[in-house]
């Protein structure tokens, strides 16, 4: 993975792979011209025609960074060869979040099930210690 700096977000090009909650929130955050959006499920892209790009066009382009959504399985997705070839360019939405929130303490909870429950539990524990949450 390439090392990120805030300067990277000025002139570099990005492909966001995955149009779920994570991918769309990343798209909204980046809010720039040099961002393309792709999802294997074409229905996910119907409201984002200006940013959506076809697989055929992706294979002809060069990106500085590829932002891979958590739900994308690199070994089973339609762009697996492209991702393998560009493996060093792959970052996640969390990489971007941490870059822009270095001064804050963050607890990251990931996974398919139980995030809300674990988040609430951690919130209650920290609040009980009279800490600002």
Where are these regions (language model features)?
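Hydrophobic, well-ordered beta-alpha structural blocks that scaffold small-molecule cofactor pockets
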Residues: 1-15, 19-44
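Short beta-strand/turn micro-motifs composed of small residues
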Residues: 18, 39, 68, 110-111
């Amino acid at each position: 993975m390439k090392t990120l700096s805030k300067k990277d977000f000025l002139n570099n090009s990005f492909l966001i792979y995955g149009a779920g909650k994570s991918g769309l929130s990343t798209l909204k955050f980046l809010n720039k011209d040099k961002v393309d959006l792709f999802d294997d499920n074409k229905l996910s892209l119907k409201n984002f025609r200006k940013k959506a790009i076809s697989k055929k066009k992706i294979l002809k382009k060069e990106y500085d960074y590829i932002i891979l959504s958590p739900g994308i399985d690199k070994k089973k997705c339609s762009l697996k060869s492209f991702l393998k070839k560009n493996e060093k360019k792959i970052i996640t939405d969390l990489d971007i979040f941490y870059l822009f929130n270095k001064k804050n303490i963050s607890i990251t909870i990931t996974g398919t099930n139980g995030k809300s429950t674990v988040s609430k539990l951690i919130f209650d524990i920290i609040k009980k210690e009279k800490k600002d949450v």
